[in-house]
Structure formats: C-alpha cells, structure tokens
C-alpha cells in the first residue's frame, strides 16, 4: 500500500498542488528518491508473497492493478471517453476501499491456508466500511482541488453537511454489521465491544466535521481510530 500510494502521490503531484501545495512540493522535490523506494517496497512485498503461495502472490498484485484503473489515464489509450475511476463519484472510494479490504482480509487467510467463512466475510465488510469512511473524510481538504480537476467525491457533490451525514450513515452501517456478527455468534462480545468502541470514536470525529476549523487535525484524529482499536483488542486478548 505504501508503494501504491506513493506512486499515486507522484502521479497526482500537479493537481495536489491546488489542495495541498506543501505535500505536492515535497513529493516533487523528492520524487527521484520516492519512486525507487516505492518500487523496491513493492518488490519486497512480492518476494514475501511468494512464500504464501499463488493466492497470496495474486493478492499482492491486486493494489497495483487497482491503481492502474483508479488513478492513471491508462484506459484512455483505448477509449478517450473513459474517465479515471478516481473521478467517478462513490466508485472512486469504492475502488480504494475494495483494494484495502481485499488485501487486509484475504492475504492473512492465504498465508494461513484457511478457507472462506462467514467470519472472513464479516472482517471484509468491516474493513471495507472503515476504509470507505476514512477516505471520504480525507477527501474534504481536497474539495477545491478536486472540483477544479473534475473529480467527484461526496464532499465536492454534497458539501460539508452532506459529508457529515454520509459519515454518520457509514459508521451506523459498521455498528450494524458488528452487532449482527455478535448476534449470530461470528464474534465474541469483548471483540464486538472493541469494534463498537472504535466505531463510536469515529462517529464522534464525524460529528465535528464542519464544526471544527482544522480539518487536518480531524483527519489525524480519525487515523487514531486504528491505533485505539488495535490497542483495545490487544488488551482484550491479554485479559480475557
């Protein structure tokens, strides 16, 4: 993911200069270092994946393939009317969330040699919704730049208030699938409690969208959900 996102930032450095000039300037200044580092990182990931077998190797290539369709203009070489998936409302975030959720869920399954199960599908749905939520929150600072380059996101189309309500909905859906998994016995109560705690934290961050002036701080706070959830899960495993 580091490799894919680094290459994405390099490819979009010019357009990112509109919404985040400091980040774009950093990427352009150190592109000669970032690009080979990203390539080496992907190469290492492929080498590690070989040990996990064909499925793990396939899943490792997944993010790179998704990036080609998501961020590059590669498809335009075949049909000039085709837009980058990155420019299509909801579909752009769906592609990112799918790429993350597929790798985070199924790569460990491939290494463990486990089979597909309802628990795995629950984990996939959970990761998909969490990534989708974070990506749309992260799109808020890019609103002006995205509008200028024709990229449609929830913030550009529905505004801050609409985005806040969308984040409420996404967090609500996450809570619903966690409760559903708990009720059906797919996850024990302590784990469900931790996941709901993280979702509640995210809901609190969403409530501040449009009401807290520094959106960068909110995004950093949203990233804290993963740390909070991980530490709480670790503590739960040590205690229970």
Residue ranges and their predicted role:
Residues 1-240:
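Multi-pass alpha-helical membrane architecture of UbiA-family
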């Amino acid at each position: 993911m580091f490799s894919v996102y680094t290459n994405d930032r390099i490819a979009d450095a010019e357009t990112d200069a509109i919404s985040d000039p400091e980040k774009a300037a950093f990427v352009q200044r150190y592109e000669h270092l970032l690009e080979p580092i990203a390539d080496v990182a992907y190469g290492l990931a492929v080498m590690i994946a070989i040990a996990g077998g064909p499925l793990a190797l396939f899943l490792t290539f997944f993010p790179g393939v998704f990036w080609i369709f998501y961020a590059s203009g590669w498809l335009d070489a075949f049909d000039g009317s085709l837009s980058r998936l990155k420019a299509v409302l909801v579909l752009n975030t769906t592609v990112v969330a799918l790429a993350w959720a597929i790798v985070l869920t199924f790569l460990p399954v491939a290494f463990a040699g486990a089979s597909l199960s309802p628990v795995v599908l629950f984990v996939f749905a959970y990761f998909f919704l969490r990534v989708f939520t974070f990506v749309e929150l992260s799109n808020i600072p890019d609103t002006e730049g995205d509008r200028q380059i024709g990229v449609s996101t929830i913030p550009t189309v529905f505004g801050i208030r609409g985005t806040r309500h969308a984040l409420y909905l996404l967090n609500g859906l996450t809570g619903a699938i966690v409760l559903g998994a708990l009720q059906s016995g797919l996850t024990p109560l302590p784990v469900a409690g931790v996941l709901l705690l993280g979702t509640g934290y995210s809901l609190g961050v969403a409530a501040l969208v449009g009401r807290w002036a520094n959106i960068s701080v909110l995004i950093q706070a949203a990233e804290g959900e993963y740390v909070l959830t991980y530490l709480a899960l670790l503590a739960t495993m040590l205690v229970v």
